[in-house]
């Protein structure tokens, strides 16, 4: 489903440490049916935050099944926002600041979105937050710090902190980007492009089920890798580096008990996020939460729509209770 891109320009935005940028752009898309209370406030806003471009996305692949069987476009008003630091919205590449862009945190990212919502939409309370992968970091940070601001959260393939093997991956990504010879020069360069290809290759290695990769021959893996690299070839080194630095500081484990929203967590293949290590602990750490798994029974790289039926039914049942 193609969604028309919209741009809202905020007069200014102040980062936590005090730096202010002016004429700050926010890229967003909307779909669904808005509903309002008697005072004109939007009551059914559901915000969505995606994972890395190019890697396997449960929500992208299961979207057709969930939407066609749940009729949510008539009940929810979805707002898909490009967060702070990502191209389209205010980011190192889109502002032209590149390596001089302000260093930001997830607290900055939440303040960025909240300011946008105040300026663009009339909302007292968000109905729900949906996040996948690193998009889940935003949702969990928000639900921990401002637990009264949403009714539900829905998280797919994410984690409560960047640590262990995932921190090692982030450090390797940092080393690759720091080795760029002309990092502190503006414009295109071969070294920047080569290093981003290396970054994408590392992400690819951790983006899907090891079981599935072991059942593919090298030609099939090469074809999948080329598709992945085509999607990521225009990734900007500055956007990625600042986002990577932000993610390495992410840790909300000790705050998960603050969450008041009804919560659904879905884990899928053993990829960048591990179900047992990353997703299952939410069952004990987050009050009033449900944790389910999309079982990896496939021998092929791609799932078909019917493969999402078991988990899709649980997702639909969870979301049904929030229809206004």
Task: Report each predicted region and the residues it spans.
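Catalytic-loop region of hydrolases
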Residues: 1-47
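N-terminal cap/lid subdomain of alpha/beta-hydrolase-fold enzymes
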Residues: 29-94
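Alpha/beta-hydrolase
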Residues: 174-261, 273
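Conserved strand-to-loop "acid loop" that flanks and positions the catalytic carboxylate
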Residues: 265-271
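Conserved hydrolase catalytic core segment
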Residues: 126-164
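Catalytic active-site module of serine/aspartate enzymes centered on a nucleophile-bearing elbow/loop
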Residues: 288-324
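Conserved acidic catalytic loop of the alpha/beta-hydrolase fold
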Residues: 107-128
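Conserved alpha/beta-hydrolase "acid-adjacent" motif
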Residues: 272-278
